[in-house]
Amino acid sequence: MTQQSHRALTIKPADMVVFTAMSKKYFYMRFFVTKFVLDQGVVPINPFTSFDYFLLDAVERDTVRRANNTLVARADELWVFGDIADGVRAEVVQAWQQHKTVRFFAFRGDKHIYEVTIDDLVYEDGVEPLIHIGE
């Protein structure tokens, strides 16, 4: 039996994988975020495309949290999209504890995504602001 060639075998893997963190209120933006990250030349790990069923409470929340923590740990960087929810804040803190680069992005209109600084972040009600001391 001979091995057939396939185009996928000639394509070099991306050098970086990023975890995309965002509030569930931006669930509807998950595919635009995935496209944005792919367009940057890196590979996204998007929990809302991997674990969207957790919103239906079909799986224990702590099971999904463990899965998210594992994916954050395996990713090279963490990119945050939109307002900071309490779970997103926890993912950022984890990434910083693991000495990962964290980048922040906001949405303008329906589909425009742009990078912002930590000083420009918007927090959901009751979420403590992020303070990052050094890398």
Language model segments and positions:
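Conserved catalytic or regulatory cores that recognize and/or transform ribose-phosphate-containing ligands
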Residues: 1-135
